[in-house]
Amino acid sequence: MASIVQPSPTFPALNLRRSSLIRPPSSVRFPLKCNAADPYKFDGGNSAGFHLLTGDTVPASFSRTRLEDSIYQNTTRLRIFSGTANPILAQEISCYLGLDLGKIKIKRFADGEIYVQLQESVRGCDVFLVQPTCPPANENLMELLVMIDACRRASAKTITAVIPYFGYARADRKTQGRESIAAKLVANLITQSGADRVLACDLHSGQSMGYFDIPVDHVYGQPVILDYLASKAISSEDLVVVSPDVGGVARARAFAKKLSDAPLAIVDKRRHGHNVAEVMNLIGDVKGKVAIMVDDMIDTAGTISKGAALLHQEGAREVYACTTHAVFSPPAISRLSSGLFQEVIITNTIPLSEKNYFPQLTVLSVANLLGETIWRVHDDCSGAIEPFSTLGID
């Protein structure tokens, strides 16, 4: 699906010292990718994505740095390491910062145990470990814990767990008796393993930040998606933002406010079991409108697809789905590509296999948002300046 993206007034260009990065062609095509020169601006057409970038495969153009005053690899105390969960995103972050990814050896023994060895010194360094705990969640979580432990034993000054997608985030409270609160347990594990800070993107609920006994920087992917939607030049009179459930109303309301204070509609549903949802009613008017459905994640797509079907029944002209985290558990792909949606807009917090691409899918990159946040944390700068104040960084 081709998209022509024009500059948008929604988020003005950041007045930061950056130079652009040029992405060369690749066999994997993303309908849209973030322009590394500006976290809020995009390149139209088919910008390239990369399956895996290593020291031997990184294009020469990626050697350009984020800053006019280059970060010198041999003198900086900033180190970025990637786990095996999302090396593409980690490479994009390091390219934005003008750094090479740290050298690390990660392997599985025959019995499935995880082995991690840092292959360069991190003594006295600010270390950032990029590892979403996406499926397989248990494997990726354990790998992150072992990476943190390795950095602590190697005398790193500070260790920040960069978790673009925080697994177990939905288990943040008891819904029935004698249940665990797994989100709190995972927070304890990360803290006790030796992390000094967590950088997470679009947590399922705000209270999850309180589960940690260490600082948490909460980065929102919302500005990236908003800027892309603003570039589509849809009349504000035709827009309506839809929350797929009552729990997402606050998120959808904030989203609508940024889109020219668009009206809000709510899909009222009742869940009869895990990953099973039933649409009950629509609160609001969508007749003849372009409906923008907003959620923090899409798992099996049951909630959002049934909501989209209801919106069409109620007379919506077009339906867009917007989410930060594309978990895409079966049968999500078949539901999302069934024709209910004009476009499905996601970010790259979770790696997406090539077989899961479909024509309506658009992928945006959050690498620059995470890279800028990492730099500000390392440089002891506040993120609470416009437009970074929209990211919720303190």
From Swiss-Prot:
Q: Predominant location of this chain? A: plastid
Q: Which GO terms describe its cellular component?
A: chloroplast; plastid
InterPro entries from the xrefs? PRib_PP_synth_CS, Pribosyltran_N, PRibTrfase_dom, PRTase-like, Rib-P_diPkinase, Rib-P_diPkinase_bac
Q: Which UniProt keywords apply?
A: ATP-binding, Chloroplast, Kinase, Magnesium, Metal-binding, Nucleotide biosynthesis, Nucleotide-binding, Plastid, Transferase, Transit peptide
**Top class in the EC scheme:** transferase
Molecular function in Gene Ontology: ATP binding; kinase activity; magnesium ion binding; ribose phosphate diphosphokinase activity
Q: What span is annotated as transit peptide?
A: 1-33
Task: List ligand-binding residues for Mg(2+).
Answer: D202, H204, D213, D217
Q: Which reaction does it catalyse?
A: D-ribose 5-phosphate + ATP = 5-phospho-alpha-D-ribose 1-diphosphate + AMP + H(+)
Query: Where is this protein localized, as stated in its record?
Result: Plastid, Chloroplast
**What PROSITE patterns does the annotation carry?**
PRPP_SYNTHASE
Under which EC number(s) is this enzyme classified? 2.7.6.1
What biological-process terms (Gene Ontology) are attached? nucleotide biosynthetic process; ribonucleoside monophosphate biosynthetic process
Q: Taxonomically, which superkingdom? A: Eukaryota
**Stretch list, region Binding of phosphoribosylpyrophosphate:** 288-303
A Pfam family cross-referenced in the UniProt record is: Pribosyl_synth
User: Which family is annotated?
Assistant: Belongs to the ribose-phosphate pyrophosphokinase family.
Q: Which HAMAP family match?
A: RibP_PPkinase_B (MF_00583_B)
The protein here is known as Ribose-phosphate pyrophosphokinase 5, chloroplastic
